[in-house]
UniProtKB/Swiss-Prot annotation:
Changing K218E: In BDPLT20; the mutation results in strongly reduced protein stability. Changing D248A: Reduces endoribonuclease activity. PANTHER family: PROTEIN SLFN14, SCHLAFEN. The keyword Nuclease applies. Its cofactor is Mg(2+); Mn(2+). One of its GO terms (molecular function) is ribosome binding. This is Protein SLFN14. The lineage of its organism: Eukaryota, Metazoa, Chordata, Craniata, Vertebrata. It holds the Pfam family B3R.
Amino acid sequence: MESLKTDTEMPYPEVIVDVGRVIFGEENRKKMTNSCLKRSENSRIIRAICALLNSGGGVIKAEIDDKTYSYQCHGLGQDLETSFQKLLPSGSQKYLDYMQQGHNLLIFVKSWSPDVFSLPLRICSLRSNLYRRDVTSAINLSASSALELLREKGFRAQRGRPRVKKLHPQQVLNRCIQEEEDMRILASEFFKKDKLMYKEKLNFTESTHVEFKRFTTKKVIPRIKEMLPHYVSAFANTQGGYVLIGVDDKSKEVVGCKWEKVNPDLLKKEIENCIEKLPTFHFCCEKPKVNFTTKILNVYQKDVLDGYVCVIQVEPFCCVVFAEAPDSWIMKDNSVTRLTAEQWVVMMLDTQSAPPSLVTDYNSCLISSASSARKSPGYPIKVHKFKEALQRHLFPVTQEEVQFKPESLCKKLFSDHKELEGLMKTLIHPCSQGIVIFSRSWAGDVGFRKEQNVLCDALLIAVNSPVVLYTILIDPNWPGGLEYARNTAHQLKQKLQTVGGYTGKVCIIPRLIHLSSTQSRPGEIPLRYPRSYRLADEEEMEDLLQALVVVSLSSRSLLSDQMGCEFFNLLIMEQSQLLSESLQKTRELFIYCFPGVRKTALAIKIMEKIKDLFHCKPKEILYVCESDSLKDFVTQQTTCQAVTRKTFMQGEFLKIKHIVMDETENFCSKYGNWYMKAKNITHPKAKGTGSENLHHGILWLFLDPFQIHHADVNGLPPPSAQFPRKTITSGIHCALEIAKVMKEEMKRIKENPPSNMSPDTLALFSETAYEEATCAQALPGVCETKTNLTTEQIANYVARKCHSLFQCGYLPKDIAILCRRGEDRGRYRLALLKAMELIETHRPSEVVFSPATGVWGSHIVLDSIQQFSGLERTVVFGLSPECDQSEEFHKLCFASRAIKHLYLLYEKRAAY
């Protein structure tokens, strides 16, 4: 079979398959006298289409044989159209577009997408080559029927290997009622015979379990090897059966294969070799081979050997047997490559459904070549649920002028490069409805290496336009520009389909631009795509933007972090909605929140729910916390009254009906019993009567059981008395890498519990439940640890990292630098100011550090972890005087205050 290779000469950022010279046109193909050539051309094209469908899409390049050919006048050819329709029964126009460019015909192939209204076929196939018996026919199953069989066999394998019920011959002979099972029993009796007579008539016919074959050709063995795989696959995948070679299927008479044409020993050996080579796929652990028995019966005519009848008994198979490898193709190593049976099954079922051993064996080679058929596991489960809300919030499609996003990065770029904004407005003209999304490197965002010669990339997504990727070069003579732009465009397109789940037709046209010129680079050829690859309307644009949201959330970038924070806010809103359902029936509640839950944000949402549910005035709801910084932050976030525990104990709150207490793990009983005071306010009793409460207000207490600081004097009831209680383990509102740090710390604490932590508290942490929540919600992020540093080295590291973040569009208000001890703040502040001035992160006059009380402001926060309790920022640096195993409790404190980036920096141990 001729190997089809990719074309590297064409400038498209696509996988391009060159199928060679082809005759096109309705009349031209009708006149073809060379039927082999006609079939070969058809086969080359259809295999290439199948491979591209299963590999993220691409372009097929065919050289037109007839120099006078015009696609507009002559069309494709009926045999080609028929093949396309068979491959794509839902309509080939959904996936294929055609364009003539000079003497080449280009076929644009969209990535395969499962039909949401039928069985979710993960890949496209020409033929499954998986057969089943249907009465007297061996049926090559359609892809959907094959998927049903695979699921059925997989389910049965989980319950044990299937068995075939065997009936005794006497039961048949004694019955007056005839049924199909009788034919199987009669065939089994026939199988026991030693010899046959020529023209002997059988007392049974073809059925689900019986197939008759007669060959008049001299080439008996080649014909048997040609047809046998179909029947063995069909019988093995159904209920077993018998193939009788040498019996006329019409007269049911024994005719045999003439003895001079057949060597019985050779025939038996060839049959065994043929069956043993059949591809199989196992769901079971035993993995047996196909079980069959071959028997050669002599056929006599007047006591003289006339020939042979060959009977093959095929037992039902535990799993599935193929007649040959499925006729399904992918792109691999720049070639159109046929899938093996095992690869095909894995992809049909998706690796998440396949046996773990196969995921290990095949996942790595299939992800790159055919991941368009599946969703990537590289994003949390809930991302798709919120992609529309995220898109509408971050990338609203408006009728106004084209928007530039993200705003902070655009502001930085346009400030540093004054001509860039005007250049971009010129480039995108005449687009009037769309979004340009900037990145320091879209290549880095999709998993490629960033290039120093690239100032930035800008992605134009606009109505009535194809998607365009502008690469702004620093050095216009950089020779790697075209390759960089094409590779980035191609990879981003693949991600939109495989990760983002975009099912429409999409192209990304790369354009290289230098700041000094709006012209494309010399030698850059304008790319033409079919009109269907333009975004036709707002709906298509929104669909693509939603796919981009998913792609961005699965990467590490400024855009990802901004989306991630909004994604976590949506998760918190969802969590608060579930939690608020307990407000009516549970007026007092202890809410245990593990690190990463962001309980302050949850507490704020609950106060809003209380106000709406009980129709309260804001002054009737009180929020209580330990620190002034957290109190000030909450005051900015809500209209309800917020105070510290100290203020709460010193004041009177006569109008308060409901109290939400946050960060109670940091409380202490200094100034009095805060818990009883809160309870008396929310559940007051009439003076002197001892009667029941006048009203039942809300008293909800939020705490992190793994960060309790004053267990003996914190004023909380003992853990055994903290009821009713609800434990929130499903909310992980931070980066995956940070969640892993917190999980390991909680696991370590559970294995070596401190004396002040009760066994009941430790039992609440389930590693499995925490991992499930992490998989559902956590996003990619950054966590780095550096040890044995000097103060100067720590300051330089922070300064360099901040400089890098600011270049990418992060703002000072995204960053918190937290010290393990409050007394270290002044020492670190001086070192950081010096380092930041040297590295020119900002101009010296702009370097401002704010204490935790200024968290709502626009400066970098520099304070202790205690003062930052209950607060969080996207980027957190945790500075610790020394790395001491006994002090690693602070790692959990640092991690619980970071959303996407965590940098843990430890000084050298002091010498004594």
